[in-house]
Amino acid sequence: MTIPAVDAAPDAPHPVGDDLWWRSAVIYQVYVRSFADANGDGTGDLAGVRERLPYLAELGVDAIWFNPWYPSPLADGGYDVSDYRDIHPAFGTLRDAELLIADALRLGIRTIVDIVPNHVSSEHPWFREALAAGPGSPERERFWFHPGKGPGGDGMPTGWVSNFQGETWTRTTNPDGTPGEWYLHLFTPEQPDLNWNHPDVRREHEDILRFWFDRGVAGVRIDSAGLLIKDPTLPEVPERPAPGQHPTEDRDEVHEVYRTWRRIADSYDGARVLVGEVWVPDPKRFADYLRPDEMHTAFNFDFMSRAWDASELRASIDLMLDAHAPVGAPSTWVLSNHDVTRPVTRYGREDSTFAFAKKRFGTPTDLELGTRRARAAALLTAALPGSLYLYQGDELGLPEVELPREVLQDPMHFRSEGVDPGRDGCRVPIPWRGTQAPFGFSPDDASAGTWLPQPADWADRTVEAQEADPGSMLRLYREALRIRRAEPALGDGHLRWLDAPPGVLAFARGDVVNVTNLSDAPADLPPHDDVLLASAPLAGDRLPPDSTAWLRVRPEPSRSRPEAP
């Protein structure tokens, strides 16, 4: 399929020369497999993304973050990379990626690619060479191969637990058929961990950064950023490890990696941004990744994981703003991503917090309640200081889909012995138009069904249907992002908390005031000049439960007057 180049947008949100764009940016996450399918094989592709770039421009985003689009056996949705310098054949070609990067930039939309430095695919040439070379070989030094414990080496080197549950070591077989060494994988056996003490590993990733920066990407999102460095003595995990002393997480030595990467990023004209996936609960140690010579930003997962509760959310906002302030980095705000339960579903549950360990089939959900809260949360997060991440489909109010077990593909499901439904439910292909599957995700003459099935009742959730509905989630997001771009007080900066009744969050950003009512009763709005936007219809000057309003509150003229002569 030939796709014409996209015309430049006259009102692109951030000029190409703006090196601080990332401090206020709205960044849209594209999970390529599920965004848009141009060739009709049931799997999303880069040509499909190119076709939909005008949609993203109209939505008002500043950048696209792509989940891994590299060649991969897809044992973990593409986070098992076998070649960092090419594109998965199901998604297109390297030339397709280059055209997409260029077309997006003409619309004022930058590109961020995913880097997975902790591990590679078990099909990566390095790992295949290591298996063939045998124990003690230089090839194996790039990974964590280790003899087992006990008679015959039958015991795993450690009892570390996988991030996907289960064991972290898999035993190899020697060329003569006898049991061999064990190798480490903090995720699945198909994702062997790299040894970041080896110079080859560091040089390779530095070259990978340059490869993509040279092709015009504006930044990289760094997967599992705190896991790269391991304690070479392989101790067991203490019950309460001291800061920096966990054998596989948040070790102090990891910061030298990111200082090197920052030097590479800063060597390019125009900002090249490092964005970290940093699951570190201690705010001070989290902020260490954001020192001026390391990453530019990192995901704020604390806010996303909190309950729909005013005191909880205010505590998280204060916690993260206070953590970022000493290092001068902007916070990032996100309600979901490709790993977590969608907000429409999460906020409609009795327990509205998020934790991987709590995911179960059949959790009761009130989608009407969840949708109201997700609309309110959309405005709340867009009003907070810093940058905003938006996962594809959240702007449509898509719920988590409880898929039949026989179609599930996520390793989190299988490694939990079927208890955890996994992450496939938030990765269902996007509905674009029409009244039945595939809802415009694939062409009408598609040769295959979508790689994950779409619910039959999604006709009113399509882009087409929501564009025609002034009260839709999509129209709310478009207006919120339009206002956010137009208002100098929004984006990067500071907030000032205002007095509010219990269950209500109110803060000022310049002359824009955000009021979010998380209580179960209407709340009085403060005196204001205009209502810029509301997530639900207002009853006079009262804000309904589970809703947010943005108000214009101009400063009152000074009451003091010079005395008459």
Language-model features: where?
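Active-site and adjacent substrate-binding regions of carbohydrate-active enzymes
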Residues: 1-530, 535-565
